[in-house]
Amino acid sequence: MTRSVTHLFDEYAQAKTAVTALERAGFSASEISLVSRYRDDGTLADEASGTTKGATVGAFAGGGTGLLAALGVIAIPGIGPLVAAGVLATTLVGVAGGTLVGGLLGALTNHGVNEKDAHLYSEGVRRGGTLVTVRVDDQRAAEAERILNEQDPVDINARRTQYADAGWTGYDPKAPGYTAEEIRKEREIYGRLR
């Protein structure tokens, strides 16, 4: 049986390191997905040239090997352009084309993430976080968890509480992605609480 092991990272570099570590441990690029609003050069995906609204995969976004070599920019209604690779990227291209309701939230729930966590992960990406998910057999789930935890992911329960304390009730797919300035302020408010 397979399951999704999913973690949110405040920093793109943490997620990139986690993906590299997963691949070095023998997880295949076909099992791993990365979704972010950031590109390798530290700019937001919506600052990348060649992105448009709708069902597009735009400019090459990252460097690296394996999964990271396949990063592309995908324009998703609601959040805006995302840097994505892996099975979730394929699903998101379908989302942008209107074949799946719910955008990132729907893609995550379709890949086995429970709805409560999918709301938090989608909101985290909207606010500038980077999501890494691994679709693995139960026998390798603990190994994937250990590798992702080594990169200091967000404590989603603490983050959910922080968001709720500020009035958040759930992910709104119609809300725009945060600007670079809003992301900076978010990091100041929430710090890197784990």
Question: Which residues fall in each region the model found?
Answer:
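Intrinsically disordered, low-complexity, hydrophilic segments
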Residues: M1-R194
